[in-house]
Structure formats: C-alpha cells, structure tokens
Amino acid sequence: REVCELNPDCDELADHIGFQEAYR
C-alpha cells in the first residue's frame, strides 16, 4: 500500500516479510 512508503515502521516489516509483500 502507498501508506507503507510514508511509514518507517513498514520498512522494518518489509525487511522481515519482503518488500513485495509489504508494499502490496
């Protein structure tokens, strides 16, 4: 989601599950 780009917390999440999953 676009919110992920503005959410620093999502960056850590992406590190765990993968960017494609986090930014889906």
From Swiss-Prot:
Annotated positions of the 4-carboxyglutamate modification: E2, E5
CC annotations in GO: extracellular region
SUPFAM superfamilies on file: GLA-domain (SSF57630)
List of residues binding Ca(2+) 3: E5, D11
Domain of life, per lineage: Eukaryota
PTM per Swiss-Prot/TrEMBL: Gamma-carboxyglutamate residues are formed by vitamin K dependent carboxylation by GGCX. These residues are essential for the binding of calcium. Decarboxylation promotes the hormone activity.
One Gene Ontology term of the molecular function aspect: hydroxyapatite binding
Predominant location: secreted
Cystine bridges: C4-C10
Binding site for Ca(2+) 2: E2, E5
Protein name: Osteocalcin
Organism in which the protein naturally occurs: Homo sapiens neanderthalensis
Name of encoding gene: BGLAP
